[in-house]
């Protein structure tokens, strides 16, 4: 199957805020991700997220860019063959996940339309 990715508008803003080298690393990571965006348990690159400290991201996946100190959180919609990128952010504690949760709540229509 051929996979693609799509950034929600807020994730596009996240990408634009990064410096040039970080932006290149993120784009490279996204290009690698679409070669196999499945969870690691299925041989892919994504690590499943769950519920922790009141933040429920069950059904979402993440990839870490260790060198850049960034995380990318995405929702894989298999039937469409698309990884929807919700947030690109720093790995500071659980901050990126809390921001991701706020984005889900703020864009409930978008989130519901993924399923």
Question: What is each stretch, according to the model?
Answer:
Residues 1-2, 57, 80-82:
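A structure-centric signal for secondary-structure junctions around beta-strands
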Residues 35-64:
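A short, surface-exposed loop/turn module that caps and links secondary-structure elements
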Residues 33-35, 80:
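A short beta-strand-loop micro-motif that forms or neighbors metal/cofactor-
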Residues 1-32, 109-115:
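Arg/Lys-rich, positively charged N-terminal/basic patches that mediate binding to nucleic acids
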Residues 13, 65-115:
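Enriched for short, Lys/Arg-rich terminal
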């Amino acid at each position: 199957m051929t996979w693609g990715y799509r950034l929600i508008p807020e994730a596009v803003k996240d990408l634009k805020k990064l410096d040039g080298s970080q932006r290149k690393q993120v784009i490279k990571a996204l290009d690698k991700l679409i070669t196999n965006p499945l969870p690691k348990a299925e041989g892919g690159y994504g690590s499943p997220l769950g519920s922790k400290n009141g933040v429920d991201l069950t059904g979402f996946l993440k990839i870490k860019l260790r060198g850049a100190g960034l995380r990318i959180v995405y929702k894989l919609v298999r039937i469409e063959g698309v990884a929807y990128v919700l947030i690109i952010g720093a790995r500071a504690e659980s901050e990126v996940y809390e921001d991701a949760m706020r984005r889900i709540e703020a864009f409930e229509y978008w989130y519901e339309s993924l399923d």
